[in-house]
Amino acid sequence: IFSKVRYEKISGTDKDIPLITNTKLYSDNAYYANSYGKGGISYYVLQNLLGDDLFFKSLHYYIDTWHGKHPGPYDFFYSINHASGKNLNWFWKKWFFDWTYPDLSINKVEKYRNGTKITIENKGGLPLPVFLEITASGKTTMLRSTAAVWETGKNLMVYNLNLPFDSISKIQLGNEFTPDKFKGDNTWAP
């Protein structure tokens, strides 16, 4: 994921073109960021989504099936779908065909019954895992959700926590591996 920073720079711009696009049509910056940055990050997100065992099982199925042949992108997509037993077409569409970019934000934090309701917004439309670090009463808790939370196409997801609203001192969205174009809306404090 060494190319995360470079990909973040071009994400959401006219250089952030769908991965399915023939690389001969890329400019130099777009070629590097898409081929290495965005491409590599898509596999990281897929691995996070499937879990290590299923990801590597599916990848080995693809490699074994297509060894010595000339697979195209669709062969990869269908092989992973078949081996994982999951219909990941929603994932392939957003990562490889659509004009999406990485931008998650903390949309709203509010008191909800006896706890706290945290709403995360996917502004860029790219399915990404959600990592939330919550500091409350001097303790830090990490919440994690895979990119599957965006499978239905909705751009909002909600955490309802049994954590008193007034005890929260900080909420931080993201981690060092997940790209985000606009980080200014990734921190919340009362």
Question: Where do the PLM segments sit?
Answer:
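Asparagine-centered polar/low-complexity signal
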Residues: N122, D185-N186
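Short beta-strand edge segments in extracellular beta-sheet folds
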Residues: W188-P190
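Extended hydrophobic-aromatic, low-complexity segments
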Residues: F56-K57, P71, L104-S105, P127-F131, ...
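Hydrophobic alpha-helical and helix-loop surface patches within well-folded domains
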Residues: I1-E121
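Beta-strand-rich binding/interaction modules
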Residues: V109-G174
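Short acidic/polar inter-strand loop motif in beta-rich domains
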Residues: K139, G174-D185
